[in-house]
Amino acid sequence: MGGRREAIERELKKLRAEREELDGRIRLLESQLEAGPAGFNGAAAGKGVGDDACGGSGACQSRVGNEFAPDGSLPADMIYRYSRHLLLPDFGVEGQRKLSQSSILVVGAGGLGSPLALYLAACGVGRLGIVDGDDVELNNLHRQIIHKEAYVGQSKVKSAADACREINSSIKVVEYHHTLKPCNALEVARKYDIVVDATDNLPTRYMISDCCVLLNKPLVSGAALGLEGQLTVYHHNGSPCYRCLFPTPPPVAACQRCSDSGVLGVVPGVIGCLQALEAIKVATGVGEPLCGRMLLFDALSARIRVVKLRGSSPDCTHCGENSVFTEEDFQKFDYESFTQSPMSDKAAPSVNVLPESARITCREYKKLADDGEPHLLLDVRPAHHFQIASISPSHNIPLSMLEEKLPALEASLKEAGEGSALVVLCRRGNDSQRAVQLLREKGFTSAKDIIGGLQAWGRDVDPDFPVY
């Protein structure tokens, strides 16, 4: 029964997504009819929307996009569509022409890539490439505004490309349904004028920067975490590459990701919009891009600061005067080993620092609790995590406060009864291992952690437990 229900739900999502796409195409044609003769050329151009052909490379490309009159002037439908751009003295016809003839690759269709891709499509970039190997998940939607509920479980790239085509059927949208890696990055990025990094992890940041240096492409790079964001343009007009600023990666403990630390939905939205702006400035030559400067955004105080960066380093191993880094070196380079981090925007990998004798599964703990064995369940997550969801009864002492709270823990353990077991858990089973290490060093020799933490509990014991 469960499998049949899941199949029906998947089919419903698929049909709803198809209906959304058809509704979008209907709205587009209706708006072009309302526009009168100025909109008819656009209607004719949009005839092939959705009739994509996929090649063996994993890229799907839509029909040909913006086309100009023989004398280079903008056609009537483009003048009507982009009239508010054309009225800007600093942008005008020449700016729109350059933008419509440019190609921009967006790496990542998540919180940053969502507004970024939507605005580039709406503003009329000639060819827009979108790279992402993930599927849409429900917990993406608070910040990844390009996706809809109907697309949950489907490819992010398909969802993003469909949304961009609904906004502007006159541009080319190229889909890459895979993660960008050293083995394919050069082939993909080589086809574009500008690359925009909208990813969320350290090894990919190094890889994209190295790729752009080898191909001599400008790189618009943004990041957002928690309530802060930042933005700069690398390897353009004398600006440094990522390695110029960070020749060695920071410690793993200093690298956070939104799946661990959280992010307020609007923050990547702000940075993604600014990334679109910087990409447009680079493509058109209008304004002063953030080359050699970094924009810092603080959402809580609503402050934006721009700080100066040092220039390109002549001693940089990758973009410096004597660099010998080649495309072959790039394709063989192990970015995950270099940064000690996974090439994924998802959760950090599990650690394994305890012997098997110091660990139990969540099912083993469930049996221990059901049998009424005396024990104390210690939850070492931060207090605000504990407020989200917890197993009852459990005591919350955050890992950061554990050592100073050992006397209180010892008293609680005595209250639980003589010979009580001390069982430790956290969100994913990493911090609980570190806690057990500390506890055993301090004399709590019977302490054990629950393998996989609350995520394993929700998966293997209680499917209704809220996983976050």
Swiss-Prot record:
Its cofactor is Zn(2+). SUPFAM superfamilies: Activating enzymes of the ubiquitin-like proteins (SSF69572). GO terms for molecular function: ATP binding; metal ion binding; molybdopterin-synthase adenylyltransferase activity; molybdopterin-synthase sulfurtransferase activity; nucleotidyltransferase activity; thiosulfate-cyanide sulfurtransferase activity; URM1 activating enzyme activity. It comes from the Eukaryota. The keyword Transferase applies. Residues 371-466 form the Rhodanese domain. Disulfide bonds: none annotated. One of its GO terms (biological process) is tRNA wobble position uridine thiolation. It is found in: Cytoplasm. PROSITE patterns: RHODANESE_3. Keywords: ATP-binding, Cytoplasm, Metal-binding, Molybdenum cofactor biosynthesis, Multifunctional enzyme, Nucleotide-binding, Transferase, tRNA processing, Zinc. Zn(2+) binds at C241, C244, C316, C319. Binds 1 zinc ion per subunit. It catalyses: [molybdopterin-synthase sulfur-carrier protein]-C-terminal Gly-Gly + ATP + H(+) = [molybdopterin-synthase sulfur-carrier protein]-C-terminal Gly-Gly-AMP + diphosphate; [molybdopterin-synthase sulfur-carrier protein]-C-terminal Gly-Gly-AMP + S-sulfanyl-L-cysteinyl-[cysteine desulfurase] + AH2 = [molybdopterin-synthase sulfur-carrier protein]-C-terminal-Gly-aminoethanethioate + L-cysteinyl-[cysteine desulfurase] + A + AMP + 2 H(+). It holds the Pfam family ThiF. Its EC number is 2.7.7.80, 2.8.1.11. The active site is at C258 (glycyl thioester intermediate), C426 (cysteine persulfide intermediate). One of its GO terms (cellular component) is cytosol. PANTHER family: ADENYLYLTRANSFERASE AND SULFURTRANSFERASE MOCS3, UBIQUITIN-ACTIVATING ENZYME E1. Plays a central role in 2-thiolation of mcm(5)S(2)U at tRNA wobble positions of cytosolic tRNA(Lys), tRNA(Glu) and tRNA(Gln). Also essential during biosynthesis of the molybdenum cofactor. Acts by mediating the C-terminal thiocarboxylation of sulfur carriers URM1 and MOCS2A. Its N-terminus first activates URM1 and MOCS2A as acyl-adenylates (-COAMP), then the persulfide sulfur on the catalytic cysteine is transferred to URM1 and MOCS2A to form thiocarboxylation (-COSH) of their C-terminus. This is Adenylyltransferase and sulfurtransferase MOCS3-1. It comes from Zea mays (Maize). The lineage of its organism: Eukaryota, Viridiplantae, Streptophyta, Embryophyta, Tracheophyta. The gene is MOCS3-1.
